[in-house]
Amino acid sequence: MLVGLIGYGAIGKFLAEWLERNGFEIAAILDVRGEHEKMVRGIDEFLQREMDVAVEAASQQAVKDYAEKILKAGIDLIVLSTGAFADRDFLSRVREVCRKTGRRVYIASGAIGGLDAIFSASELIEEIVLTTRKNWRQFGRKGVIFEGSASEAAQKFPKNLNVAATLSIASGKDVKVRLVADEVEENIHEILVRGEFGEMEIRVRNRPMRENPKTSYLAALSVTRILRNLKEGLVV
């Protein structure tokens, strides 16, 4: 399977090494910095390379700049920076391009778990609440930094709350979000879901990547799960 990577930071480098170890072929890596034999500097050159799927591991802006072009080029896309879809107009455009081209956008679960159960129960969900706890030093104070909707959270804290946007897509609801600056060394996500189906509580304590303490290891691993499913016949 031929895979293109967008972004060559901590996650991009991890994925490049993982792909080479697991029988995938890197078609191209798009980034303005860094060095790799498959590196390209622009989207046009990136799209000239033959590939089965592209992986975004860069930024919300990269998703907005490149998603539609990638899909129109006949390439499926895996997205990590899901906060880009807090822009409802952009989300609608991407869905329309998928419908017209027959291509797919795969939403990586990122730094959380339980998305399969949340998506399964989405039609019966009455309330979904995300509480994210981060080290207070990032904000210079302790306490509740933000409380509001997922759409507001993604706009005010675009680098912090891709998780909120992912939950909104999976649940079909505008998730209630609390961002708390706390005495924690690892990012913690607590998800409470209530509805006619029952109740779910999901708690994830993320270990950061050594290369970038602001990036969770689980986020990178969530992309490898999608890639394994695309390659293998048995999908989990």
Curated annotation (Swiss-Prot):
Keywords: NAD, NADP, Oxidoreductase, Pyridine nucleotide biosynthesis. SUPFAM superfamilies: Glyceraldehyde-3-phosphate dehydrogenase-like, C-terminal domain, NAD(P)-binding Rossmann-fold domains. The active site is at H189. Specifically catalyzes the NAD or NADP-dependent dehydrogenation of L-aspartate to iminoaspartate. GO terms for biological process: NAD biosynthetic process. Its EC number is 1.4.1.21. The iminoaspartate product is unstable in aqueous solution and can decompose to oxaloacetate and ammonia. GO terms for molecular function: aspartate dehydrogenase activity; NAD binding; NADP binding; oxidoreductase activity, acting on the CH-NH2 group of donors, NAD or NADP as acceptor. InterPro entries: Asp/hSer_DH_NAD-bd, Asp_DH, Asp_DH_arc, Asp_DH_prok, L-Asp_DH, NAD(P)-bd_dom_sf. Homodimer. Pfam families: Asp_DH_C, NAD_binding_3. NAD(+) binds at A10, I11, D31, A58, S59, Y66, L80, S81, A111, N162, N212, P213, K214, T215. It catalyses: L-aspartate + NADP(+) + H2O = oxaloacetate + NH4(+) + NADPH + H(+); L-aspartate + NAD(+) + H2O = oxaloacetate + NH4(+) + NADH + H(+). Pathway: Cofactor biosynthesis; NAD(+) biosynthesis; iminoaspartate from L-aspartate (dehydrogenase route): step 1/1. Transmembrane segments: none annotated. This is L-aspartate dehydrogenase. It comes from Archaeoglobus fulgidus (strain ATCC 49558 / DSM 4304 / JCM 9628 / NBRC 100126 / VC-16).
